[in-house]
């Protein structure tokens, strides 16, 4: 006759089930992340780090813990949430699985103290390693998308702001900057949050003009600064290494200084006179040609560029352009976006 479990043994079995479930959860989440590092990013280093963490967890997944598994009797198998039914983008898939891994490691850390305290210590350190992995991967994602982006929309105040931006995103836009120098902070915060959500849905980068605090408040992908704004070093200290920092430049000296200061991309212009930059003389296509030969980081020709003159900028060496009025004032932003991208995509990709 099999003796019933004592109360202590019953608690032990529950702990074993918790450890078993969370080891599975952590390993599964890491495998999902690893697959994107391997096939989506072609990044062997990040994929190898995921694999190392998975193998470390596997060492602790003993037959003793597996034997405690009771899937038919687990009420959690019936629990779900609408947000788990679909994901808006690769970014949301990755974020959800990083959360899954981090939460599982925290559970393992606490309950392992009742099983093997050495595992608890290891899980604590692994959780910090996963935080670092998340930061590095998201930063890599941002930089990779920045390099792939050809068209950059800088917004201007508009009653149709959200509709125009979404129309451009539908046309293939992958990089957006929110710029409004006249609105009060409450409106800026509201609009920035909505734009950031749109970019999240469409898998585009979201940059905030000038305001590092606003960029952090809405979890933007970065900030774009002017020559008279916050020093790059301070902005980097506040934003960290994984978010993007762009800088406007008007001549080769400013370009070289920006590269030396470690910005992620620059604006080159204004190529033509534009009401967006009142009082600034156009740099012309000469500066575009100089940038094409001398700039080692992503750069965007900007200032008065539209469907009528984009090919002049391309002929001068531009592979990426930033626009304002040509999309914000377009009757059909989706079609204009598609046309501009069709011209830019004829250029040979950078190696």
UniProtKB/Swiss-Prot annotation:
Main enzyme class: transferase
Gene Ontology cellular component annotations, sorted alphabetically: cytoplasm
Sites where the protein binds 4-amino-2-methyl-5-(diphosphooxymethyl)pyrimidine: 177-181, 209, 248, 277
Domain of life: Bacteria
Annotated cofactor note: Binds 1 Mg(2+) ion per subunit.
Keyword Cytoplasm found: no
Enzyme Commission no: 2.5.1.3
Region (Thiamine-phosphate synthase): 130-351
Region of interest (Unknown), residue spans: 1-129
Record-linked Gene3D superfamilies: Aldolase class I
Family assignment from sequence similarity: Belongs to the thiamine-phosphate synthase family.
Protein name per UniProt: Thiamine-phosphate synthase
């Amino acid at each position: 006759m099999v003796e019933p479990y004592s109360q202590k043994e019953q608690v032990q079995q529950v702990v074993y089930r918790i450890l078993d479930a969370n080891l599975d959860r952590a390993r599964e989440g890491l495998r999902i992340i690893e697959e994107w590092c391997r096939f989506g990013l072609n990044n062997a280093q990040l994929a190898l780090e995921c694999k190392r963490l998975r193998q470390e967890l596997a060492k602790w997944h003993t037959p003793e813990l597996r034997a405690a598994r009771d899937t038919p009797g687990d009420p959690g198998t019936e629990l779900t949430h609408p947000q788990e039914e679909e994901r808006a983008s690769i970014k949301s898939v990755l974020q959800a699985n990083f959360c899954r891994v981090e939460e599982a490691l925290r559970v393992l850390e606490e309950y392992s103290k009742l099983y093997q305290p050495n595992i608890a210590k290891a899980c604590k350190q692994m959780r910090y390693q996963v935080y670092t992995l998340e930061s590095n991967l998201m930063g890599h994602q941002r930089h990779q998308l920045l390099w792939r982006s050809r068209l950059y929309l800088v917004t201007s105040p508009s009653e149709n702001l959200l509709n125009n931006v979404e129309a451009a995103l539908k046309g293939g836009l992958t990089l957006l900057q929110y710029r409004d120098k006249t609105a009060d902070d409450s409106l800026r915060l509201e609009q920035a949050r909505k734009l950031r959500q749109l970019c999240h849905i469409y898998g585009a980068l979201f940059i905030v003009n000038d305001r590092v605090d606003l960029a952090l408040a809405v979890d933007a992908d970065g900030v774009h600064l002017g020559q008279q704004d916050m020093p790059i070093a301070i902005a980097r200290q506040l934003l960290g290494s994984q978010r993007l920092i762009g800088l406007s430049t008007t001549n080769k000296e400013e370009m070289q200084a920006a590269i030396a200061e470690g910005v992620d991309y620059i604006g080159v212009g204004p190529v033509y006179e534009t009401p967006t930059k009142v009082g600034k003389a156009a740099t012309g296509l000469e500066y575009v040609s100089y940038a094409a030969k001398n700039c080692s980081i992503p750069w965007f020709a900007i200032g008065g560029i539209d469907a009528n003159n984009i090919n002049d900028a391309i002929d001068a060496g531009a592979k990426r352009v930033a626009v304002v009025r040509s999309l914000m004032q377009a009757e059909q932003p989706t079609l204009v976006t598609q046309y501009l991208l069709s011209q830019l995509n004829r250029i040979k990709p950078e190696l």
